[in-house]
């Protein structure tokens, strides 16, 4: 079975076979891709994904810029503001695709974008999870959200009904330059051409962010049921080992499923967005961890999402977002953990 991260593991850890002595665990490229319960290895990630701000190189160049001009939030804002001001001349509807808060799209902002202030708070405090988020970087969250909804293809009041498909259509229709999403979205945007796709880190105005890379992690971890028979456990371990070491298994995962797997025998992906993600790492940029797997509940995400939507529509204040983020976290953590 699978879990999505530490929060999921907390519910299922009693059923997790210890993988620390398995051949599968020995094939991992980094220990950071394993979830532990004390000394036991309870779960192992089997697919690594990356997200950031996908951009259309052709449109960015037409506006007079390249990726080299964008090294932090201030640069991103300057470029986006300029594109927005010249949108008629450039033939676009906005710098950014619509930040849709319909259920097909809101996860990009209440989860993936919200990861950034959490990541920087954890980093500053030297922690990996918390029962009470402080909201140290919520002013930074505000400025990137303000940029997304201001330099956009649509009026912020319309975001509640804007969908994931709307954003894809705007981006592939060359009506927007920037689109926050991840490596998994390649199939949706491939019509623009591989050479025309670039990816930027999500800058939120934090000191030293010129060294920041893309957001890389996993929400997909294999667990083996310790209540199964020994024969079934061994058969499962043998199969998973075959998946990540054999030519047929690694080909199926890379080519048929489009996965980047965190194992030594992994095949290279043909997805150009994954190539870009790998280049950031090769260039020594610091990847942003996926800390959203420590968010206390789905209810917490929904509270943040509702507050973001109301703020964008002008019916709510930013303070409501802060309350949903900070007070909501403490409340939901307590409900989940007692």
How should each PLM-predicted stretch be described?
Residues 36, 40-46, 51, 77-130, ...:
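Extracytoplasmic/periplasmic solute-binding protein
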Residues 61, 85, 250, 267-269, ...:
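Conserved C-terminal helix/tail region of periplasmic/extracytoplasmic solute-binding proteins
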Residues 39, 63, 191-256:
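Extracytoplasmic/periplasmic substrate-recognition and gating elements
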Residues 73-75, 159-173:
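Short helix-initiation/N-cap motifs at beta->coil->alpha
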Residues 17-31, 95-96, 100-103, 118-143, ...:
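Short, solvent-exposed loop/beta-turn-alpha elements that line the ligand-binding surface or hinge
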Residues 1-2, 90-92, 173-181:
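Alpha-to-beta junction loops
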Residues 1-51, 55, 108, 112, ...:
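Hinge/lid segment of periplasmic solute-binding proteins
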Residues 80-81, 126-161:
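Glycine-centered hinge/linker elements that transmit conformational signals in sensory
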């Amino acid at each position: 079975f699978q879990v999505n991260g530490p929060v999921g593991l907390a519910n299922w850890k009693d059923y997790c076979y210890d993988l620390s002595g398995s051949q599968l665990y020995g094939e991992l490229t980094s220990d950071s891709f394993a979830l532990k319960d004390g000394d036991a290895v309870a779960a192992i990630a089997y697919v690594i994904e990356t997200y950031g701000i996908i951009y259309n190189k052709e449109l960015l160049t037409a506006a007079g810029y390249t990726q080299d001009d964008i090294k932090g939030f201030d640069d991103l804002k300057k470029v986006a503001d300029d594109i927005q001001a010249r949108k008629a001349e450039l033939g676009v509807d906005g710098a950014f695709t619509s930040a849709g808060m319909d259920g097909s799209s809101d996860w990009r902002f209440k989860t993936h974008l919200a990861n950034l202030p959490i990541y920087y708070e954890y980093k500053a405090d030297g922690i990996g999870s918390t029962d009470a988020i402080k909201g140290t970087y919520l002013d930074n969250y505000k400025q990137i959200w303000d940029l997304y909804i201001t330099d956009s293809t649509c009026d912020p009041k319309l975001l509640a009904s804007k969908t994931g498909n709307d954003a894809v259509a705007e981006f592939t229709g060359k009506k927007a330059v920037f689109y926050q999403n991840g490596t998994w979205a390649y199939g949706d945007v491939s019509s623009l051409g591989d050479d025309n796709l670039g990816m930027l880190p999500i800058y939120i105005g934090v000191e030293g962010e010129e060294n920041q890379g893309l957001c890389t992690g996993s929400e997909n971890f294999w667990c083996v049921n310790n209540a199964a028979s020994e024969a079934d456990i061994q058969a499962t371990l043998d199969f998973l080992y075959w998946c990540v070491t054999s030519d047929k298994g690694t080909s199926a995962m890379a080519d048929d499923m489009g996965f980047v797997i965190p194992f030594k025998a992994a095949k290279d992906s043909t997805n150009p967005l994954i190539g870009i993600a790998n280049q950031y790492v090769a260039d020594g940029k610091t990847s942003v961890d996926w800390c959203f797997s420590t968010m206390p509940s789905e209810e917490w995400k929904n509270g943040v999402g509702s507050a973001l939507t109301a703020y964008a529509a002008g019916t709510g204040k930013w303070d409501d977002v802060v309350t949903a983020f900070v007070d909501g976290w403490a409340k939901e953590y307590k409900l989940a953990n007692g």
